[in-house]
């Protein structure tokens, strides 16, 4: 699968923002390459449940665009750009990669349910008006057009964009700007601990 950030990197963030993020990145990661362990520490994501840990690993892999096992500064900026300023289509492509845990190009019900549960463990701003199971059932009922129990990228992109409720819910559940803003305010030590470490209730 191609780089979802093609043509989108540093230019999406202002020079001031880039300087601030570069300073923070190099202060906390002097090697210039962020490992998965450092990624967890950097974002304050520690003492997580197994499902939440799997989600963090999947998020790391989607941001590691060249698949070398590290996130360098350019990948880091591209990720921030996507999270903070990405267009709907870009974000949906990234959401799809995040949900497609086994990387086979389709999302099945178990993959979606696993990630939704994990997201709710980590992200206290995510929508909780429906249980994870109810939300997963709703997604498949609305956008699994051919009824094969799997969502292709095309089904996912078209279906979500046509359904404002799904689009709004997915956007809220995967809104990492709260974590990013806390990082900007130097509060990352507290993020992802305490009650967020509890296993998500379906």
Swiss-Prot record:
Disruption phenotype: Guca1a and Guca1b double knockout mice show an increase in response to light in dark-adapted cone photoreceptors. Dark-adapted cone photoreceptors show a delayed response time and a delayed recovery time in response to light. Guca1a, Guca1b and Rcvrn triple knockout mice show rod photoreceptors have a reduced current decay during light response. It comes from the Eukaryota. Keywords: Calcium, Cell projection, Lipoprotein, Membrane, Metal-binding, Myristate, Repeat, Sensory transduction, Vision. Ca(2+) 2 binds at residues 100, 102, 104, 106, 111. Pfam families: EF-hand_1, EF-hand_7. The keyword Transmembrane does not apply. Gene3D superfamilies: EF-hand. One of its GO terms (cellular component) is photoreceptor inner segment. The keyword Transferase does not apply. The modification Deamidated asparagine is found at residue 3. Ca(2+) 1 binds at residues 64, 66, 68, 70, 75. In the retina, expressed in rod photoreceptors (at protein level). Expressed in cone photoreceptors. Residues 31-49, 51-86, 87-122, 131-166 form the EF-hand domain. It is a lipid-anchor. Ca(2+) 3 binds at residues 144, 146, 148, 150, 155. Coiled coil: none annotated. A lipid is attached at residue 2 (N-myristoyl glycine). InterPro entries: EF-hand-dom_pair, EF_Hand_1_Ca_BS, EF_hand_dom, Recoverin. Stimulates retinal guanylyl cyclase when free calcium ions concentration is low and inhibits guanylyl cyclase when free calcium ions concentration is elevated. This Ca(2+)-sensitive regulation of retinal guanylyl cyclase is a key event in recovery of the dark state of rod photoreceptors following light exposure. May be involved in cone photoreceptor light response and recovery of response in bright light. Binds three calcium ions (via EF-hands 2, 3 and 4) when calcium levels are high. Binds Mg(2+) when calcium levels are low. This is Guanylyl cyclase-activating protein 1.
């Amino acid at each position: 699968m191609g780089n979802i950030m093609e043509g989108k990197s540093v230019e999406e963030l202002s020079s001031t923002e880039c300087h601030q993020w570069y300073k923070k990145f190099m202060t906390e990661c002097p090697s210039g390459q962020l490992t998965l362990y450092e990624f967890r520490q950097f974002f304050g994501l520690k003492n997580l449940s197994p499902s939440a840990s799997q989600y963090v690993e999947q998020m790391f892999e989607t941001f590691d665009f060249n698949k070398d096992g590290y996130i360098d500064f350019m990948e880091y900026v591209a990720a921030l750009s996507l999270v903070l300023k990405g267009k709907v289509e870009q974000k949906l492509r990234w959401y799809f990669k995040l949900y497609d845990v086994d990387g086979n190009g389709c999302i099945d019900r178990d993959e979606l349910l696993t990630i939704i549960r994990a997201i709710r463990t980590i992200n206290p701003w995510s929508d909780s008006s429906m249980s994870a199971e109810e939300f997963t059932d709703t997604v498949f009922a609305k956008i699994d057009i051919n009824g094969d129990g799997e969502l292709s990228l095309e089904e996912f992109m078209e279906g979500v964009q046509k359904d404002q409720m799904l689009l709004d819910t997915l956007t809220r559940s995967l809104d990492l700007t709260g974590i990013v803003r806390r990082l900007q305010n130097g509060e990352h030590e507290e993020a992802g601990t305490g009650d967020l470490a509890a296993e998500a209730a379906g």
